[in-house]
């Protein structure tokens, strides 16, 4: 239940001017102001002879019951109680038996009725627990049923109600994907003999709200199981552009994370990498990493660095990473420490790729300009993995060969850890 669901707005004229509570027995004084009987009685019993709201002297202390207002308050109170009961029933997690019946209903009548309400109930059930997600994923032909629902829509001609049904189906597929035992078969259901299903998911990612975008990105990430599926997804019109819009600093943090995960999942084919570079992904990732006004989660930082690591495997990517004034590499150096072990490994791999493996001259200048050598030396003293230690050692060799002066400032304090 959301916080807003707990707030009930009470009409001002239903409140007693003294207690500010909803009046149980409204009565009016000779001044025309209405109070709750108990509150105004206490006021008068206290020796007061004025109207509390107007401070006029009371000509008499007679109470006139306000029957009309009392009836309005009763009607309003009944409606609030009914609405609260309905909302509580809707928000309560359905049982497995109820869900099994709901699934059977969708199977039998999927062509004849609006199943949005039923599917919404299944979404709530799936998001309730890991066991529930496993239960849904294990239901015979349920996944295929949901995929078939997606295949039945054409957003140019389909009714709004049917479109909402498809959205709920996508939410369920995204919710239960981690419990699907055969990921490749799941991917084939969506991608094989039904390219329109992929178009629907991409369309929903482009046009949906934040929650739906996150579900679509997660689903696309999950079905990217091999080079063929990655290419099919990445080359769908407008998807990469939309994913890149979703990683802007102004986007929802969860959407940024899911979009980065999707980009990582589809980026391994070289054709996709080159497409990402043409779309200036490195610039967008650099802006995201270097933005001092936003507090990125550790996970988002790791994913940004992972993307840079992937793109650094191409000549064009390395050129872009080292381009301009070296802002991208400088940002990577700043993320070498104090983020996480995974972030350190990705950042070191980026530096190793451009500086040691492919010996980009601009990389050496950028790294030394932000005291990168100091951080490399400090990392060698840390509890890093053997693979990272080897890359750090290689980096120091490159810096020593290319410019002994960049190490001279650190000789007195760090010579004891020099690996050569």
From Swiss-Prot:
Please give the SUPFAM superfamilies that the UniProt record associates with this protein: ARM repeat (SSF48371), RING/U-box (SSF57850)
Q: Where does the record place its ARM repeats?
A: 130-178, 184-225, 228-268, 270-313
- What role does it play? Functions as an E3 ubiquitin ligase.
Q: What is its EC number?
A: 2.3.2.27
Q: Does the keyword Chloroplast apply?
A: no
Per the UniProt record, the lineage of the source organism begins with: Eukaryota, Viridiplantae, Streptophyta, Embryophyta, Tracheophyta
- Pathway named in the protein's UniProt entry: Protein modification; protein ubiquitination
GO-annotated molecular function: ubiquitin protein ligase activity
Instruction: Tell me the domain of life.
Output: Eukaryota
One Pfam family hit:
U-box
**The entry's keywords:** Repeat, Transferase, Ubl conjugation pathway
Tell me the ranges covered by the U-box domain, including all copies.
9-83
The name on file for this protein is U-box domain-containing protein 27
Q: Does the keyword tRNA processing apply?
A: no
One GO BP annotation here? protein ubiquitination
Reaction catalyzed:
S-ubiquitinyl-[E2 ubiquitin-conjugating enzyme]-L-cysteine + [acceptor protein]-L-lysine = [E2 ubiquitin-conjugating enzyme]-L-cysteine + N(6)-ubiquitinyl-[acceptor protein]-L-lysine
């Amino acid at each position: 239940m959301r916080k807003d669901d707990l707030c009930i707005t009470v009409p001002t004229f239903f409140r007693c001017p003294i207690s500010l509570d909803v009046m149980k027995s409204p009565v009016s004084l000779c001044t025309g102001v209405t109070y709750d009987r108990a509150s105004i009685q206490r006021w008068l019993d206290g020796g007061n002879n004025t109207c509390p709201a107007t401070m006029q002297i009371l000509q008499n202390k007679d109470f006139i019951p306000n029957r009309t207002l009392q009836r309005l308050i009763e009607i309003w109170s009944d409606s609030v109680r009914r609405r609260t009961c309905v909302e509580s029933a809707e928000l309560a997690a359905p049982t497995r038996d109820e869900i099994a019946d709901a699934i059977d209903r969708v199977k039998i009548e999927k062509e004849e009725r609006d199943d949005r309400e039923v599917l919404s109930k299944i979404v709530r059930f799936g998001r309730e627990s890991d066991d529930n997600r496993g239960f849904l994923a294990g239901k015979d032909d349920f996944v295929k049923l949901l995929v078939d629902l997606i295949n039945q829509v054409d957003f140019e001609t389909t009714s709004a109600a049917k479109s909402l049904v498809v959205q709920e189906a996508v939410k369920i597929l995204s919710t239960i994907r981690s419990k699907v035992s055969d990921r490749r078969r799941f991917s084939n259901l969506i991608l094989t003999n039904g390219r329109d299903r992929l178009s629907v998911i991409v369309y929903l990612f482009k046009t949906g709200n934040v929650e739906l975008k996150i579900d679509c990105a997660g689903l696309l990430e999950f079905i990217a199981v091999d080079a063929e599926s990655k290419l099919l997804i990445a080359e769908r019109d407008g998807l990469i552009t939309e994913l890149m819009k979703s990683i802007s600093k102004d986007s929802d943090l969860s959407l940024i994370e899911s979009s980065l995960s999707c980009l990582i999942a589809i980026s391994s084919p070289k054709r996709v990498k080159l497409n990402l570079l043409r779309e200036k992904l490195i610039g967008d990732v650099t802006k995201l990493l270097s933005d001092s006004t936003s507090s990125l989660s550790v996970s988002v930082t790791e994913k940004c660095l992972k993307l840079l690591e992937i793109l650094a495997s191409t000549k064009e990517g390395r050129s872009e990473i080292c381009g301009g004034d070296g802002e991208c590499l400088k940002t990577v150096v700043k993320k070498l420490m104090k983020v996480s072990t995974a972030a350190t490994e990705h950042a070191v791999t980026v530096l190793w790729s451009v500086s040691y493996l492919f010996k980009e001259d601009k990389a050496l200048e950028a790294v030394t300009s932000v005291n990168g050598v100091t951080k490399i030396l400090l990392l060698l003293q840390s509890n890093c993995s053997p693979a990272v230690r080897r890359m750090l050692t290689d980096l120091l060799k490159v810096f020593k060969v290319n410019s002994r002066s960049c190490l001279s400032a650190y000789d007195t304090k760090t010579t004891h850890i020099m690996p050569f």
